[in-house]
Amino acid sequence: IANNQRRLITGGSQFDAEVLNQERQRVASAMRRRGYFYFDQELLCYDADSTRGRKQIDVTMRLQEYLQHQSEEYKEKVFRKYHIAHVHFHLDYDPARVPDDEEMFTSSADGYVFTWVGKKLLRDKVLVRNCPIEPGAMYNERAVERAYTRFHQLAPIKYVDISFEQISANELDCHIVLSRGKLKSV
């Protein structure tokens, strides 16, 4: 996390509140790339000490004090690493239409679950190949960002939504909703 090459705050640099906020975002993102699904930049704050000398401020990043007053359950949730249990693909999702059970099809393999109505939007292997979120892997915010990018690059897909559901103490199910664009008539 304290990657000296990437950190935004260095000794001798100008005191800038925007840069301090960007550093909080960078650290929180680094935590989420390492499996800490619930870690948020709002958990971090700074102490700034200007008594050191003329035009000098010592800045220290720390965790917010309100964390001390939170339940142990909350603290464990925030500082626990999460793994992906299953990746669910919901294909051709249409919020305006709830299909009957007879219309829905489901298949699964190796921790991936596919649910669709009618003709399948894409083959399972195409979906899996383009999905950097993998069952058994640690949660990684960067994998989620790459998944959005990859799915938006596939021709038939116009809508992508990725969400997570906590299913046990340290496991998340990933839900990926993919929809094709509406056909336009002329």
Region locations from a protein language model:
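Periplasmic polypeptide-binding modules associated with outer-membrane biogenesis and secretion
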Residues: 1-186
